[in-house]
From Swiss-Prot:
Keyword Zinc: yes
Lineage, opening ranks: Bacteria, Bacillati, Bacillota, Bacilli, Lactobacillales
TM region(s), chain numbering: none
Biological source species: Streptococcus equi subsp. zooepidemicus (strain MGCS10565)
Coiled coil: none
Official protein name in the record: UPF0758 protein Sez_1052
Family: Belongs to the UPF0758 family.
């Protein structure tokens, strides 16, 4: 059996070349990303230490840059590389879920966006632009900020709608608290964006609030649509 204590000659990179990435352990894959260890730990020992600080592999996403840097052997550069890897993995997953089929329901959009935004610790507002066949032209992040800051203005959303020559759009934002119940500001914003779309001849199909575990659709549950 492969052992980091007895076999440093056959390193993870060589094992990946010889056996393929699917044969490597989480420890070995992480060691490839970390590249080097430090004076106290070999890179495989460092990756094992990092993984031992997690309840599950998914918890790695929850570490901020600062929290990663506080772990022994993980400096600023390694922390940045880990965060970049996690973000890229998220984007690859999202891109893989994109289909050419038309958007048929709010639930379909909500399921996708729960995966994309559910774990975000800041509020993200995303506009999804569709053509006349309800196929997605572009998904655009309009706003990233804290819950204390006001949400994006409709003009920012409409600018990209015109740029994409969209027929309709869906607005989605997350609640970092995990609660999807809309606030008074959410209602006000929904009214504003719907009026603005009506004025320009665009169709606002829905405004959806998501968290990791659920969603709220203004089209499904309010009288605004």
């Amino acid at each position: 059996m492969y052992s980091i204590k007895t076999d440093h000659k056959l390193m993870p990179r060589e094992r990946l070349i010889r056996l393929g990435p699917e044969k490597l352990s989480n420890q070995e894959l992480l060691a490839i990303l970390l590249r080097t260890g430090n004076k106290e730990k070999h890179v495989l020992e460092l990756s094992a230490y990092l993984l031992s600080s997690l309840d599950s592999l998914a918890d790695l996403k929850k570490f901020s840059l600062q929290e990663l840097q506080r772990l022994s052997g993980i400096g600023k550069v390694k922390a940045i590389e880990i965060k970049a890897m996690l973000e890229l993995a998220d984007r690859i997953q999202i891109a893989g879920q994109a289909v050419a089929a038309p958007v048929l329901s709010s639930a379909q959009v909500a399921e996708k966006m729960m995966i994309e935004l559910g774990d975000k610790q800041q509020e993200h507002l995303v506009a999804i632009y569709l053509d006349s066949q309800n196929k997605i032209i572009e998904e655009k992040t309009i706003f990233i900020g804290t819950v204390r800051k006001s949400i994006a203005e409709p003009r920012e959303i409409l600018y990209y709608a015109c740029k994409n020559m969209a027929t309709s759009l869906i607005v989605v934002h997350n609640h970092p608290s995990g609660l999807t119940k809309p606030s008074a500001n959410d209602y006000h914003f929904t009214e504003k964006i719907k009026r603005s779309c009506d004025y320009l001849g665009l169709i606002c199909l829905d405004h959806i609030i998501v968290s990791k575990h659920g969603y709220y659709s203004f089209r499904e549950k309010s009288d605004l649509f």
